[in-house]
Swiss-Prot record:
GO terms for biological process: DNA recombination; DNA repair. Its cofactor is Mg(2+). NCBIfam families: ruvC. The lineage of its organism: Bacteria, Pseudomonadati, Pseudomonadota, Gammaproteobacteria, Lysobacterales. Mg(2+) 1 binds at residues 8, 141. InterPro entries: RNaseH-like_sf, RNaseH_sf, X-over_junc_endoDNase_Mg_BS, X-over_junc_endoDNase_RuvC. The active site is at 8, 69, 141. Mg(2+) 2 binds at residue 69. One of its GO terms (cellular component) is Holliday junction resolvase complex. This is Crossover junction endodeoxyribonuclease RuvC. Belongs to the RuvC family. It is found in: Cytoplasm. Binds 2 Mg(2+) ion per subunit.
């Protein structure tokens, strides 16, 4: 089995999701949760809380690979910068443990999980629940993190079958 950690970075909440992928390519739910960062009085405190929270998840679940959502351009420059900083902290927590990081754009994730690059949050939550046989409504950030992990599982399986890298497996060339 391959264990994958999916991360949906955020400066207020960061979603984390862990799945196992068996030898047949089936994904199995292990863990998901939002890391809520709003309890800190400063932004630096939130980043520290994010680093410690992700480190604890990595320590407890021992993923072999990590997939993270890429930053999208926002109309609010301050929000985009904070998101980029949170994403940098998340990647740092991963690379400090010598784990491979795979990055996917939001449209790629939506296409892989829902079949439509313009899917909305509810569609992602629903499909992640169906794919992982989960009951009840998933919290949005955690569902997004599981979706990133599922996307990587699918792209990785395709890359392995084709004998190419995950970047090449996603490419249309």
């Amino acid at each position: 089995m391959t264990r994958i950690l999916g991360i949906d970075p955020g400066s207020q909440r960061t979603g984390v999701g862990v799945i196992d992928v068996d030898e047949y390519g089936c994904s199995h739910h292990v863990y998901h949760a939002p890391l809520v960062l709003l309890g800190q009085s400063s932004f630096a405190g939130r980043l520290k809380q994010l680093l410690l929270g992700l480190s604890a998840v990595i320590e407890e679940y021992s993923p072999k690979e990590v997939a993270i959502e890429k930053v999208f351009m926002s109309k609010n420059a301050d929000s985009a910068l904070k998101l980029g900083q949170a994403r940098g902290v998340a990647i740092s927590a991963v690379v400090l443990r010598d784990l491979p990081v795979h990055e996917y754009a939001a449209r790629q994730i939506k296409l892989a999980v829902v079949g439509r690059g313009g899917a909305d949050k509810q569609q992602i939550q629903h499909m992640v629940g169906v794919m992982l046989n989960l009951q009840g409504r998933l919290q949005s950030d955690a569902a997004d993190a599981l979706a990133v992990a599922i996307t990587h599982a699918h792209v990785s399986a395709t890359a392995q079958r084709l004998g190419v890298s995950t970047k090449q497996a996603w490419s249309r060339k």
